Amino acid sequence: MRQMIVGNWKMNGLGAPSRDLVGEIAEGLATIPSPPQVVVCPPFTQLAGIGPLLKGSGIALGAQDCHQAASGAHTGDISAAMLADLGVEYVVLGHSERRRDHGELDETVREKTQTALAAGLTPIVCIGETGDQKASGESRDAIGWQIQGSLPDGFSGVVAYEPVWAIGSGNPAASQDIADMMGFIRAELVRQFGAAGKTIRILYGGSVNGRDAASILPIAEVGGALVGSASLQADTFLPIVRAAVDL
């Protein structure tokens, strides 16, 4: 299975600079033999403009959220079907910033995941413990409950482990900590989903950069990376993509 590198642009990117960025990423990707799967997740406002630019580039289009309802009276929200209509293939759900800023619960993430799957999107469901949970030795309990609460029966998407305390810090988790948690997450997926849990891709996220990607991506059970700030420039994103080649 090829590695997957997902660029989460968060609330960044205006029209022309966003189009320039995907052009630079596409140019760089074209020079990489047997590249990994690459997904870019711009803000909603850039999806329609960027989608056509990705055709034939090997880069898939992703979004950063969707509403749990298929349609209806939800002012300001975006449905999974609307995303699919724009050519979106992936959607990030349950990111810690959504949970923090919008009070999203595991139940909400689960409902959004079901809606995304029904619309033909591949959900990338984020899980991760806080600094306080890590300090008190509750990391595994927190992750276990998130897996149980956020992933619906028959889940067939991607899981992204992002320790909340590492996001935006500039310092990813230590390799041994990542390895330990990845092993635990895999065991929990198998416990919850049986044999299907063995094939669910797990990404690592949390201050991933070109310097550390080469040591993170080869860790057992790591199937790729969910990249935040380093995805906002081609010269910081492409080194992560290159680190995933041949893994």
UniProtKB/Swiss-Prot annotation:
The keyword Isomerase applies. GO terms for molecular function: triose-phosphate isomerase activity. One of its GO terms (biological process) is glycerol catabolic process. Its EC number is 5.3.1.1. It catalyses: D-glyceraldehyde 3-phosphate = dihydroxyacetone phosphate. The active site is at 95 (electrophile), 162 (proton acceptor). GO terms for cellular component: cytosol. Its main location: cytoplasm. It is found in: Cytoplasm. Belongs to the triosephosphate isomerase family. Involved in the gluconeogenesis. Catalyzes stereospecifically the conversion of dihydroxyacetone phosphate (DHAP) to D-glyceraldehyde-3-phosphate (G3P). This is Triosephosphate isomerase. The lineage of its organism: Bacteria, Pseudomonadati, Pseudomonadota, Alphaproteobacteria, Acetobacterales.
